[in-house]
Amino acid sequence: IIVMDKNVIKQIILNQQDFIGRIKLQSRNVCFEENANYVLVGIRRAGKSYMLYQHIQHLVANGHSIEEMLFINFEDERISDIRKEDLYLILEAYRELFAFQPIIFLDEIQNVEGWEHFARRLADEKYRVFITGSNAHMLSREISSTLGGRYLTKEIRPFSFSEYLEYHNIHLPQHWELSPIRADVVRLFSDYFYYGGLSEVFDIQDKKSWLQSLYQKILYSDIVMRKGVRNERSLRLLIRKLADSVMQPTAIKRLQDILQGDGTKITRDTIGSYLDYLHESYLTFGISSFTDSISQRESVKKRYFYDNGILNLFLFLPETKLLENLVAIKLYNKYGDDLYYYNKNVEVDFCVPNDGLLIQASYRMIDEATRNR
């Protein structure tokens, strides 16, 4: 049994305090209640860590000292083997450095099995705690039950286009489309359209390589390793087929037929599990037909990607699919499970029955059938 070295934890605490005190951040709108604890979840690189950095700088600007901040990134290779039995050492290490009651930030803790018991104890002992993770399983009933209502949750999504413009210091005046700023907006929208809203990609030259690396990290670390996927080839092929099928309702049986046609033996249950894994890791989400029965809604869905940049890795001549995917992202972020598509007698890309909304997404209006819809 390897026992974690407290001196390593101390070094990490001090390193993070120094780093967060110096880093310059682009502000993003997020509000935390003053005395609440939080779990932040979302796709990797959506900006969860930077939201914590921003909040720490806000706390320091409003009277706290940086020494009160206990920030641990669990993807730091120096503590990659930490176990739940070692988590108490984090507080011990901090107390040997400082006499404050710390405000605790636990970044990407989901890979420490049983982390929720430590989080529950911290809340019970009246610490203020902020936790981030890249897996929707952190919102599951089992974990929520262990946390016992002591944490509020926020899902952090990639930047919207309005946030993307703010990041680039673009503020739209009235009638902006007739002003010189229009050229900047068009240029930035093109980047956002093809490369998505994950903030770390914004200032990178080789965006496609960065997105490919991120995709491989999510696939391998958050799905293959975490879930024990034995047939990685079939999972990769499924993701490609989902990208090809964006805009189209797809049944699990149909996916099975497609995969088996490519020589992959796979059961419907396995495909169902893979789809759950993709949703939990914030790669894809699905919407159901408003006219389907409850059972059909689970088995037949239109599936989209949480970020256009990752979807675009798989596409050739991508514009039509990227546009509908971008509309789906915007609507899903706003309406969640109240968003459907409609396909009885007439096809409608998106509908929100509670608000009486019917929305059609079309990149070009040349096709007469598209205009008629």
Task: State each model region's role.
Residues 2, 68, 202-357:
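Accessory nucleic acid-recognition modules appended to NTPase machines
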Residues 5-17, 136, 142-249:
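Interdomain motor-coupling "hinge/lid" segment immediately C-terminal to the ATP-binding subdomain
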Residues 16-35:
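Pre-Walker A adenine-sensing motif
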Residues 40:
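Hydrophobic anchor at the beta1->P-loop junction of P-loop NTPases
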Residues 44-45:
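Walker A (P-loop) phosphate-binding loop of P-loop NTPases
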Residues 48-49:
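Conserved lysine of the Walker
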Residues 70-102:
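Short glycine-rich substrate-engagement loop in P-loop NTPases that contacts/grips substrate
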Residues 116-131, 145:
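Conserved catalytic/switch belt of AAA+ P-loop NTPases
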